[in-house]
Amino acid sequence: LPPRYFHPKSLNFPAEPGRCLPNLYEFKRNYLTSLKSENGARGTVGMPLALGMYELLPLWHAVFTRLGFNVKVSPMSTRRIYEKGQFSIPSDTACYPAKIMHGHIETLITDGVDAIFYPCLTYNMDEKMTDNHYNCPVVAYYSELLNGNVEELKRVKFLYPYLNINSKKELAKELYTYLGKFYNGITKSEVKAAVEYGLTRYAEYMNAVREEGARALKFARVKNKRI
């Protein structure tokens, strides 16, 4: 069957038969959904696949897996997920990606996770290509709003530390200090190793995305397609 693409009005149109264009969105979705986690002795940590978690999932998934947690990722966004969390959205002025985060949180709680992780990040990863790398304030601090508006979060540990992901040393220190408040027995050395592992997995993910992007550009040039 030909691949399918979504119209902005949510209508589903099949692609023209025989046209197999590179699809980086599909590539990234497949990459993220392929991340697996084994049953961990320290419990299950849920990660909502929305806002800033979408691009940083390979990092956090690897960190918590290495620390001995089972990582449960919420499904790809759907209308049903949005509807599940719509009653805890405090403002209509928030962007849709922020609004749907409520549904992802509710879904993870329903799935029975022990904790949910969505950190506050003033800065995104510095890719050395722009003047600054500030996060949008909504992305950076939406955990605070979730904590104040999603009543069901009282049923789980909601982990939302303020972290610096651009310093390996600082990230390990901050995570160790924060997680130690909730989990006994976590050592500095294992957090340091987990951060190292997570940053390596994140770099692999970014390299894979860049390689796929280069492949798509090459395809467009060879086939004389618009770029």
Task: Tell me the role of every PLM-derived stretch.
Residues 1-227:
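An N-terminal assembly and electron-transfer interface module characteristic of large anaerobic redox
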